C-alpha cells in the first residue's frame, strides 16, 4: 500500500476497472513533463531510451525475447486499428468475436467486415449458470471453421470475468489457418501470459488496469503475420 497514495484505511480492489496510480509512475510522469522546461538539455537518445525500457519490461512480462516487436500506442482501439489495417477479407470469410465484447475490440472489426462485405460472428454467452464458462469456451471452438479469417478476443471477459483457454483456441485457429488477436487488458499483469505458449498473431493491452500505467497508453505485440505491414499513420518515429 505504501507504493500508492491511498488515504485512510481504504482497500482498493477494482483494478479490473482502473488501477490507482503508483507513486513511481506519477513521479515519472511529472519528470517527463518537466523535461519540456529545458529543451536545450534534451539529447537524441532521450527520444528512445525511455520507450525502449518500457518495451523491454513488457516483453519480459509476456516472455517475449524480441522486445522490438513491442509497440506503444494510445489505446486498444488504436492498436486494433493497426491490425485491421493490415488484414484483407474475402466476402466468404468471417471474423469471430465474443458476445458483449468491449467496443475497442469490436468497432475496428465491424468496419473491416463492412468494407469487405464479410461476416461478423458473435459467440454469445450461454444462458446457464453451471459450467457457463466451460460451455462458452466450447461454443467459441465450434464457431471457428474454414471460413474464419480472424478470432479476436480477450483471455478474460471484461463484463463477467469468464476465462478463455487461449491455447486451445490458438490450436483451433491454426488448424483452419485463422489469425488469433488478443486484447489482454483484463488479464495481462494480473495473470500469467506466455507469448510462446499462446502464440497470438497480435496482443494489445491498455496500460491503465493491471499494468498499473497511466490512462491513454497501451502496449502492442505484433507477430510475423504483420511484418512489413502499414501503420494507420506515418511519422518519423513510429517505424
Regions found by a protein language model. Give the residues of each.
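Pyridoxal 5′-phosphate
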Residues: 1-239
Amino acid at each position: 500500500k505504501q507504493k500508492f497514495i491511498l488515504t485512510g484505511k481504504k482497500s482498493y480492489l477494482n483494478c479490473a476497472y482502473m488501477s490507482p496510480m503508483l507513486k513511481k509512475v506519477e513521479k515519472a510522469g511529472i519528470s517527463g513533463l518537466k523535461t519540456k522546461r529545458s529543451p536545450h538539455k534534451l539529447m537524441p537518445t532521450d527520444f528512445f531510451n525511455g520507450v525502449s525500457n518500457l518495451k523491454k519490461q513488457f516483453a519480459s512480462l509476456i516472455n517475449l525475447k524480441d522486445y522490438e516487436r513491442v509497440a506503444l500506442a494510445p489505446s486498444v482501439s488504436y492498436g486494433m486499428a493497426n491490425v485491421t489495417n493490415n488484414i484483407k477479407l474475402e466476402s466468404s470469410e468471417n471474423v469471430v468475436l465474443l458476445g458483449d465484447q468491449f467496443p475497442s475490440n469490436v468497432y475496428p472489426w465491424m468496419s473491416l467486415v463492412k468494407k469487405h462485405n464479410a461476416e461478423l460472428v458473435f459467440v454469445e454467452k450461454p444462458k446457464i449458470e453451471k459450467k457457463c464458462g466451460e460451455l462458452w469456451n466450447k461454443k467459441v471452438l465450434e464457431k471457428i471453421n474454414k471460413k474464419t479469417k480472424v478470432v479476436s478476443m480477450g483471455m478474460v471477459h471484461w463484463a463477467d470475468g469468464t476465462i478463455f483457454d487461449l491455447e486451445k483456441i490458438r490450436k483451433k485457429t491454426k488448424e483452419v489457418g485463422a489469425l488469433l488477436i488478443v486484447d489482454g487488458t483484463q488479464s495481462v499483469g494480473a495473470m500469467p501470459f506466455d507469448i510462446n505458449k499462446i502464440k497470438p498473431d497480435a496482443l494489445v493491452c491498455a496500460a491503465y488496469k493491471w499494468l498499473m500505467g497511466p490512462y491513454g497508453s497501451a502496449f502492442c505485440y505484433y507477430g510475423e503475420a504483420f511484418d512489413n505491414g502499414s501503420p494507420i499513420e506515418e511519422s518519423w518515429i513510429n517505424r
